[in-house]
Amino acid sequence: MSENHNEVELDAIGQKCPMPLLSTKKALSNIEKGQILKIIATDKNAVKDLKAFCEYTDHEFIDDRSENETFIIRILKG
């Protein structure tokens, strides 16, 4: 994980479902409330899984975008 001011980056490239979700849960437990976790993943289900995860937690799904076959997802820790 790398950190940039209020944004922490999680490299989940190459992880298959459910690992991006599990890695995200672990990363969120290690950052402060109000910080943003930026997840970089290649698993096609990561966006859907992380949106659903945020719906059932205090975390806010900020946005997602895709570049080539990589998905960039940002979550605000609640």
Q: Where are the predicted features?
A:
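Short amphipathic
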Residues: N6-I13
